[in-house]
Amino acid sequence: MDKKTSRLRRALRARKKIQELGVNRLVVHRTPRHIYAQVINPEAQVLAVASTVEKAVKELLKSTGNVDAAKAVGKIVAERAIEKGVATVAFDRSGFKYHGRVAALADAAREAGLKF
């Protein structure tokens, strides 16, 4: 089993557990160049989105593939989710380790008022 397959297996297992809870989830995906975050409800509807691909976010950042970019995305997605009336979510790290950019995004979302 390669690295990607292992990550996807972990992600699937975590998603099934979150689905059983029936709560909104904050989904994170990272690539070497960008980071993406979405708040998705139990019916699989996307409620809020933020990523380093967005022009408004890109203009604020020097680089899109670092911890500072992840913090910016975390803050923005939390603000957009709270605007839509979502205050509590489950954190879906998509099988990525809770470290570096993933952890920075989560911490920034918490600081912006999202509870998980």
UniProtKB/Swiss-Prot annotation:
InterPro entries: Ribosomal_uL18_bac-type, Ribosomal_uL18_bac/euk
Biological process annotations from GO: translation
Record note on quaternary structure: Part of the 50S ribosomal subunit; part of the 5S rRNA/L5/L18/L25 subcomplex. Contacts the 5S and 23S rRNAs.
CDD domains named in the record: Ribosomal_L18_L5e
Keywords: Ribonucleoprotein, Ribosomal protein, RNA-binding, rRNA-binding
Species name: Shewanella frigidimarina (strain NCIMB 400)
Source organism superkingdom: Bacteria
NCBIfam families from the UniProt entry: L18_bact
Protein name according to UniProt: Large ribosomal subunit protein uL18
Family membership noted in the UniProt record: Belongs to the universal ribosomal protein uL18 family.
Gene this protein is translated from: rplR
PANTHER family named among the record's database cross-references: 39S RIBOSOMAL PROTEIN L18, MITOCHONDRIAL, LARGE RIBOSOMAL SUBUNIT PROTEIN UL18M
Described purpose of this protein according to its UniProt entry: This is one of the proteins that bind and probably mediate the attachment of the 5S RNA into the large ribosomal subunit, where it forms part of the central protuberance.
GO molecular function: 5S rRNA binding; structural constituent of ribosome
Xref: HAMAP family: Ribosomal_uL18_B (MF_01337_B)
One cellular component term from this protein's GO annotations in UniProt: cytosolic large ribosomal subunit
